[in-house]
Amino acid sequence: MAYDIKYLSILPIINSIPNSILYTITGNMLGDGSISLSKINKGEGIYSMTMDVYSLNYLHHLNDNIYSQFTNTKFYAYPNILLPQHKGKEITQYHFKTKTHPLFTALHSLWYKWNNEKNKFIKIVPLNISEMFSEISLAYWIMDDGYFYSYGRAKTVLLYTESFSKEECIILQSLLEKLNIKSTLKIRDKINNRYRIRISKTSLDRVLFLVNFICIKNLIFI
């Protein structure tokens, strides 16, 4: 396996955490997870995540079992019904974020690249993602960004991957293939050439076999 320079440079940090934790974070980063760089603390990484109101138990699960071991974390409701301008409104989203930590700084260097045109960092698929991916990653990826898809008699799972390029989606398909999961690309946006990954219906049982023991209660989607 060839390693890129960035991955080699952060291997000591990566190797300092259990594989199960790394695999979980990978699944989250393929889904709704985000890492930003603090403007106050010398560009150190902060992990954050926003999900709908129905996913609060899942966010607490991630916080309690994964992210709180690195730093203190804080939850926010949106809209903030304690504010006068939001009085009477229903909460639609929950957001949590960590404080800065060297692990998140290191992972940011893998998961993001600077885009001059957009003048910001954009999320990418890391070159060595195969070293950080397992069935645990798949389970959390599905819980983050999986969708039960039923068209006629065809029942399967869609993974929301339109934030990644077609080439990156193909890389992600190769990860699924290593788990003996077949998939196809489903066009989402022809103009911008964006795709979702559709798990082949013949592989649905394989997916369930791999992830059901990992998915938390109330988030087994099929």
Which sequence ranges carry the predicted segments?
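Internal intein/HINT superfamily modules and their associated LAGLIDADG
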Residues: 1-222
